[in-house]
Amino acid sequence: MIGKHCILELCECNSVKLDDEAFIRTTIQMASKVAGAQLLNLITHKFVPQGVTGLALLAESHISIHTWPESGYAAVDVFTCGDQTMPDKACQLLVEELQSKRHSLKTLRRDTPVMISNALIN
Amino acid sequence: MIGKHCILELCECNSVKLDDEAFIRTTIQMASKVAGAQLLNLITHKFVPQGVTGLALLAESHISIHTWPESGYAAVDVFTCGDQTMPDKACQLLVEELQSKRHSLKTLRRDTPVMISNALIN
């Protein structure tokens, strides 16, 4: 398996935090750390009138967060490669830090087409 | 629906192109354009001894590419929001530009948990 890709939908989050670019940056840094990943670069963008996007380039792939404060919603991806990383821990941290009261987590294995016939493992 | 997330596995690609950071940058810029998306920021990283990661921050979400030249493989995500973008066109361009002879494309809808019970639409 090349990697594990967690697709996380966070609902009923704290809207103030979802719209706080500095908070999103710090939270992505924390998420990288608890996942056991190496953060190589991090870019964020604050949209007008609301919303933040954060993209973390990891040695082991990436974390992305897109927020819709007006809906209390964030779309998160945590994609990590290798056996040493724990993307589930990053997801759990994001649920807690963004104070999501309702979430959905799906995990895909990323691999060559021959290997992904059973791509949805959770 | 918040957005459409294309998960693309590219196999049997041109390994030289997969390892060419400048080529990956240019290709992501082209992919953003054909998708009808607005590219706000683009970061890339060249790994040693091989491999490139590219992350594009779009006004409409993101594009990510992670390459394994030694396997001829690239893991691609094209996540766009709104009705005006065409992530499928970006995927088709990436298949062609990276000269993938075999690929797999899955499309997820991204939305709040209530709405994603039928998340896999393709």
Curated annotation (Swiss-Prot), chains A, B:
Transmembrane segments: none annotated. Keywords: Autocatalytic cleavage, Decarboxylase, Lyase, Polyamine biosynthesis, Pyruvate, S-adenosyl-L-methionine, Schiff base, Spermidine biosynthesis, Zymogen. Its EC number is 4.1.1.50. The active site is at 61 (schiff-base intermediate with substrate), 66 (proton acceptor), 81 (proton donor). The modification Pyruvic acid (Ser) is found at residue 61. The keyword Electron transport does not apply. GO terms for cellular component: cytosol. This is S-adenosylmethionine decarboxylase proenzyme. The lineage of its organism: Bacteria, Bacillati, Cyanobacteriota, Cyanophyceae, Synechococcales.
